[in-house]
């Protein structure tokens, strides 16, 4: 799992900086949330899935228990060459099935408005935006959004 965690940290920092010009404050935030996930990880309530292509990591998605009925979707990321090829939907389907299997009633996630393709995947899977917050400390004009999904059995 250590190499998976290193991949998640490295690629989130690299891609968000290159594609969204997010600051070092965001990089520190990534370190904090990933290490918190690792420290609290329980395979009965949490999961981390790494997409591989030709033996190399090519994307990630995770589920973390927020409370007994709520999960947080985290670390959803695809390498640029893997985007818009259906892999994001596959990762999302796997993560949401894990939530159903574990009996979660709701899933939430945090994203930024600039993540247009990811936001489309969220909408396609039934998530809806519930609120937004200025995160200018991460970069100019960065707005973080909270999206939620009620899980229907």
Predicted regions and their residues:
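C-terminal "cap" of GNAT-fold acetyltransferases
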Residues: 1, 105-153
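Acetyl-CoA-dependent GNAT
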Residues: 1-81, 89-94, 98, 102, ...
